[in-house]
From Swiss-Prot:
NCBIfam families for the chain: hisG, HisG_C-term
Protein's recorded name: ATP phosphoribosyltransferase
Taxonomy, superkingdom: Bacteria
The entry's keywords: Amino-acid biosynthesis, ATP-binding, Cytoplasm, Glycosyltransferase, Histidine biosynthesis, Magnesium, Metal-binding, Nucleotide-binding, Transferase
Keyword Glycosyltransferase tagged: yes
Keyword DNA damage on entry: no
Length: 283
């Protein structure tokens, strides 16, 4: 039976549960449940702290896990990303008190508070910078005000929390994070149950990022229209009652699809319809 780790709480939890449910897997009905057995799919789900998931997967005790890229890298566990899931996106950056033009080199000799010590140490080592890394389990922004640290390294979203504490982010991003599906590094690729879950989830992720576009198109502009909507492999063309027209169906990315519809309308296409895709096996 396949054993899969899922975040038990936090920003990744609901999105992970939703994507697995859409992929046809059983979801827990009580937030206190630590395990859920799905006998019809031969899968057992374990609900764990997001920070611990990479450790369990890397040890080989669990086959797959959903966690954040930043958490997986910071764990130091021997895991590999099998699939990017497209939710929980964030950036991980250095920040320090505003009022100075900070560079990463300015961190030399300073105290840096973070909840991701390994990620920070690896970055500093790669840059040849020596600094003291202080591990905190949260609310690292207040550490400078309390005199525990001189700078921080943390997940940055809108930047509102940094501004509230008069901090400014600087330097390159240490990690562009999002939810990821991980497995133990070097896992065999011939596990049918594992591959089935991966492909199901891949289909949901693809469906969330694309939609189906249908429109009627005069044959005189068909070549130009197909350049706008090339589809995944090739668009589907169907004859209409009027032999001078054809119906076109093609997948397009959700991002920017309104612009695509505008282009088709300007070109002369009619009855342009966008519809969501629930799931697919597209790749």
């Amino acid at each position: 039976m396949l054993r899969v780790a899922v975040p038990n709480k936090g920003s990744l939890s609901e999105s992970a549960a939703e994507i697995l449910s859409e992929a046809g897997y059983r979801r827990r009905t009580d937030s206190r449940d630590l395990t859920v057995l799905d006998p019809s799919n031969q899968v057992e789900f374990f609900f764990l702290r997001p920070k611990d998931i990479a450790i369990y997967v890397g040890s080989g005790e669990l086959d797959l896990g959903i966690t954040g890229r930043d958490l997986a890298r910071d764990s130091g566990a021997p895991v590999a990303e099998r699939l990017s899931l497209g939710f929980g996106r964030s950036t991980f950056r250095y920040a320090a008190p505003a009022g100075k033009d900070w560079t990463v080199e300015d961190l030399a000799g300073l105290r840096i508070a973070t909840s991701y010590p390994n990620l920070v140490r690896d970055d500093l080592s790669a840059r040849g910078i020596e600094a003291s890394v202080i591990r905190l389990d949260g609310a690292v922004e207040i550490s400078i005000q309390l005199g525990v640290a001189d700078a921080i390294a943390d997940v940055v979203g809108s930047g509102r929390t940094l501004r509230q504490h008069n901090l400014v982010a600087f330097g390159d991003t240490l990690c562009d994070s999002e939810g990821v599906l991980i497995e133990r590094a070097g896992s065999p690729d011939d596990d049918s149950a594992r591959n089935q879950l991966v492909e199901r989830v891949r289909g949901i992720v693809f469906a969330q990022q694309n939609l189906m576009l249908d429109y009627d198109c005069p044959k005189t502009i068909l070549d130009d229209a197909l350049k706008i909507t090339p589809g995944l492999e090739s668009p589907t063309l169907s004859p209409l009652a009027d032999e001078n027209w054809v119906a076109v169906r093609a997948m397009v990315p959700i991002k920017g699809h309104n612009g695509v519809m505008d282009e088709l309308a300007d070109l002369g296409a009619k009855a342009i319809l966008a519809s969501n895709i629930r799931s697919c096996r597209a790749l």
